[in-house]
């Protein structure tokens, strides 16, 4: 691989479009993107699959290729390394600029590997992003081979994080198979996301106020879980809060089960079809949580 990767140059080109008309692309070379995938994959594998992080940090939910909204999040929260970040997955698909989005996130991971963290979402999986837009974007702008390189990278992402032993973070939610944190630590990477079981549930399950215990999930994958499941899980592991993403919520964040769980969603005006706000959660060093909101853009005059 002849490309020497200049990470600072890559980041500065990705940030050059700040203030440009939303939708302007940044076309890195295919070799540079391959380099981002390979180097970040190395780093993911050198760090645990269950991250143990320290506050202060900012936690973000789904981005889904809404690159200009990702830039707005950083403008609001502080561009790395000004703030520490944990993203909860779903970087690609649905939005128009999955490539810029994932490239900036991987570049920051490489440059600030101890202060910038990315978890795996259910869309960081070949069978899903083959269908919902990322494959087509890779094929149109680069090559199918590059999409496969991303798959190899995504298969190595960590799947959960614990902040200061008190906040449990993952993309989707809990699993009926999850009884000890050691089970997460034992998941071997690289791995695809299976159709069922612990890893699938961490990336796919949803809280549901009408569910007692565990229920069927309308997604046709994984389960729903009720407030009592959340309470028992927190009590058993001495956690204070579950922080997850995976569902659009109107205000960008939404509590469940008497504030024992929070859903974060960071893509405002999701897909151009919703009027939702986007939010990120700021956790200070005393573990106090506050929310920074990206309001949805005003409906453009037709």
From Swiss-Prot:
Segment forming the signal sequence: none
Record-listed E.C. numbers? 3.1.3.16
SUPFAM superfamilies named in the record: Metallo-dependent phosphatases (SSF56300)
Q: What is its main location?
A: cytoplasm
Q: Which residues are named in the active-site annotation? A: 123
Q: How is the cofactor bound?
A: Binds 2 manganese ions per subunit.
Q: Which SMART domains match?
A: PP2Ac
Reactions performed catalytically: O-phospho-L-seryl-[protein] + H2O = L-seryl-[protein] + phosphate; O-phospho-L-threonyl-[protein] + H2O = L-threonyl-[protein] + phosphate
An example of a GO molecular function for this protein is: protein serine/threonine phosphatase activity
| Cofactor(s) of this protein | Mn(2+)
Question: Where does the source fall among the domains of life?
Answer: Eukaryota
- Specify whether Translocase is a keyword of the entry: no
Binding residue positions for Mn(2+) 2: 90, 122, 171, 246
GO BP term, example:
positive regulation of insulin receptor signaling pathway
Report the SS bond pairs.
Answer: none
- Could you identify this protein by its name? Serine/threonine-protein phosphatase alpha-2 isoform
The organism named in the record is Drosophila melanogaster
Q: Which gene encodes it?
A: Pp1-87B
């Amino acid at each position: 691989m002849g490309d020497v990767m200049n990470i600072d140059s890559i980041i500065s080109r990705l940030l050059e479009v700040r203030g440009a008309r939303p939708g302007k692309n940044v076309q890195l070379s295919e070799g540079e993107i391959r380099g981002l995938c390979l180097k970040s994959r190395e780093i993911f594998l050198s760090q645990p699959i269950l991250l143990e992080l320290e506050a202060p940090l900012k936690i973000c939910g789904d981005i889904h290729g809404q690159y200009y909204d990702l830039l707005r999040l950083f403008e609001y929260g502080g561009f790395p390394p000004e703030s520490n970040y944990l993203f909860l997955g779903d970087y690609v698909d649905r939005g128009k600029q999955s490539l810029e989005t994932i490239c900036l996130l991987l570049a920051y991971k490489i440059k600030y590997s101890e202060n910038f963290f990315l978890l795996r979402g259910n869309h960081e999986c070949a069978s899903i992003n083959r269908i919902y837009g990322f494959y087509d974007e890779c094929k149109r702008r680069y090559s199918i081979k590059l999409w496969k390189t991303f798959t190899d990278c995504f298969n190595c992402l960590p799947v959960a994080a614990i902040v200061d032993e008190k906040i449990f973070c993952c993309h989707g939610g809990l699993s009926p198979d999850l009884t000890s944190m050691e089970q997460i630590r034992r998941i071997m990477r690289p791995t695809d996301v299976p159709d069922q079981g612990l890893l699938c549930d961490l990336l796919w399950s949803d809280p549901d106020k009408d569910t007692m215990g565990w229920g069927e999930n309308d997604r046709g994958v994984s389960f729903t879980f009720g407030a009592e499941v959340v309470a028992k899980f927190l009590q058993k592991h001495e956690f204070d809060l579950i922080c997850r993403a995976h569902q659009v919520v109107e205000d960008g964040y939404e509590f469940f089960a008497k504030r024992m769980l929070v859903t974060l969603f960071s893509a405002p005006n999701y897909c151009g079809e919703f009027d939702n706000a986007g939010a990120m959660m700021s956790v200070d060093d005393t573990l106090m949580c506050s929310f920074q909101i990206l309001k949805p853009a005003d409906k453009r005059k037709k």
